[in-house]
C-alpha cells in the first residue's frame, strides 16, 4: 500500500468549497472511487491554522495510481484547475510505503456516509 500526501494552503473564504471538493462526497474522492485499487483518503484540517489542510490518498500500489492518473487525466486536470482557484499553495509532501498495515473491517473511509 502507498500513501500520497499533499499540504494545501486554502484562500480565505474558500474553505467550504475546498472541503466540498476533497471531502468524502466530493468530486475528487468520487473520481478516485472509479478505480478499485483506491483505498480511501484522510482529509485533515489544521486546528491552529485554518487555511492549512493535509490530504492523504491510499492506493494498493503505485502502478495503479499512475494508470489512474493517465486514464482519467482530462477529469483530473479539470478538478486540479478548480482546486488552483481555491488555494494559495500546494506542496506535495511525498509518496510513502506502508510498513505495517492493520486489518481493515468495514468500508474504506472514502465510502462511509
Outline where the language-model segments fall:
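Glycine-rich beta-strand-turn "strand-cap" elements at beta-sheet edges
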Residues: 2, 39-53, 77-113
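Short, well-ordered beta-strand segments in beta-rich or mixed alpha/beta enzyme
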Residues: 2-9, 39-71
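An amphipathic, aromatic/His-enriched active-site/gating alpha helix that lines ligand/cofactor pockets
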Residues: 23-40, 58-96
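Generic structural motif
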Residues: 11-13, 62, 101
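Short, surface-exposed ligand-recognition loops at beta-strand->loop->(often short) alpha-helix junctions
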Residues: 9-22
